[in-house]
């Protein structure tokens, strides 16, 4: 067989021309310190802030402190197998979590991994946990109501879609109950709900999940949980995971309600991380950027413009106070970021007034424009009337004689307090709220004994369901009150048939 030198040289040239180097250049470093969910590594010269890093044992971390000699890293997940001297690699990516429809009805951890024992979550969509909030021109003003089903909120401190409304109060004053009831009331409202449990007992989270399942609310809800037993980095990350999942739906033109229960525990976890990373402590040992921790989270809740789909994220962040002190550091930070707050009073709760909303300290800065016309008409002055009743009630403790006008205000105030009480997990449709508040503000309840108000309301709603469903339908469809004469006649008919005369 003859060897053709030209053919061989042509083949070699072709091979050289088509050669593509197939190798990866990965920047690696060495772990120099490990402990308490924190690692330090040397040798990662070009790492970016917030970049995902891969440890030798398969765990991941996030770069936080970029210093001249080493990098401070928070570890996402188990750090018991990581040792000093282990290799750590850059990934060139930032932290992302799975998002999409397949997460609905599931309970996941802050990394998007299922913890409910129902198998893998199949989705190929991911979103970064840290993302810029919509800009000024990408937003719309809040114009649609978000009905919580709670008379005290929908009448006194209404919430609109795209609003951030802080729920603040001491422990055991009913904050979580308000959130769960609001989620239950979103059934058939074309709303997706995300409940983020931060630093709670696992038994408590289990109870909330079972409540949602029992009332059929898990069909439109995602639960993100970072329990008290998990490392601080996961507690810090949980709210950002929740809002990343919410953004996926918002940019599809859908409406989302997200509950952060509660941000006080996230702030404590962030303080812990910052102190371990040797960042300079400030007031109450919190780092200087603790305001930015919450502002960049809550600014991602918005009602976006029609060009971006017209979707919304409504946020209900919680803050736990100590002895009702709403002037504390984290509390005032979040109050200044949000569009209003609902303050739950310890004294009111213990007096059996539930939900224990303090009308004087609670406000909604944008929700009023989202109220339906009917509710605006019946509840216009209710919050001020209730706050003035509380003041008058304090004066009556001195035992002075009262004139007829003051006595009438006190009588109306006592009945208002009773009407605004509501049992747990029984949200009320807005049309029923409007009818009972109309009866209250137009004096139909002034002669009803205070002790009978709860029974009066039950029979009142039963009567309207059976005898005058068209009135409820009118309010539901037109968002406005029917003719006053029609409503007055229906309420008078009920009073004539009942034993409350």
Curated annotation (Swiss-Prot):
Q: Where are the transmembrane segments?
A: none
Q: Quick check: keyword ATP-binding in the entry?
A: yes
Where is it mainly found?
Answer: membrane
- Output the CDD domains linked to this UniProt entry: ATP-synt_F1_alpha_C (cd18113), ATP-synt_F1_alpha_N (cd18116), F1-ATPase_alpha_CD (cd01132)
Q: Which UniProt keywords apply?
A: ATP synthesis, ATP-binding, Cell membrane, CF(1), Hydrogen ion transport, Ion transport, Membrane, Nucleotide-binding, Translocase, Transport
Q: Where in the cell is it found?
A: Cell membrane
Q: Hey, where's the site called Required for activity on this chain?
A: 362
Q: Name one Pfam family in it.
A: ATP-synt_ab_C
Q: What does this protein do?
A: Produces ATP from ADP in the presence of a proton gradient across the membrane. The alpha chain is a regulatory subunit.
Per the similarity annotation, which family is this? Belongs to the ATPase alpha/beta chains family.
Report the protein name in the record: ATP synthase subunit alpha
- Recorded source organism is Streptococcus pneumoniae serotype 19F (strain G54)
